[in-house]
Amino acid sequence: MKISIAGAGAFGSAIASVFAKGGHSIKLFSPTNFKELCATRVPRKLGNIKLPAEIDIVSSLEKNEKNEYLFLAVPTQNLASFCKKNKSFLTDRPLIACCKGVDQETGLRPSEILSEYSSKVAVM
């Protein structure tokens, strides 16, 4: 499978590592610490754990355009704004929420936020 993961924090990086070890093609979207992560391949929140070389770290969702699945490992409080900003990359593919809780402003669960952008929504 071709998988994109938005969010290179602890959870997103861990998910990317598991899928890469399973032989899947992985693109890990890291807009905030892209250069550091490319240089060290060590996510800030995972200690000394290195990301497998098979993971392609990208700074733009445009590089994820052809991937089949998009896992969103961003905090629930940032999910709605992330989706609005990246709307064009969310349609026509399954979206998998990798976050917990509800949006404090709207009271919406991650699945409800994502359902505004795709009819194919799941929660991990």
Residue ranges and their predicted role:
Residues 1-51, 56-59:
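NAD(P)+-binding Rossmann beta1-loop-alpha1 motif at the extreme N-terminus of oxidoreductases
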Residues 51, 58-124:
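Rossmann-like NAD(P)(H) cofactor-binding subdomain of soluble oxidoreductases
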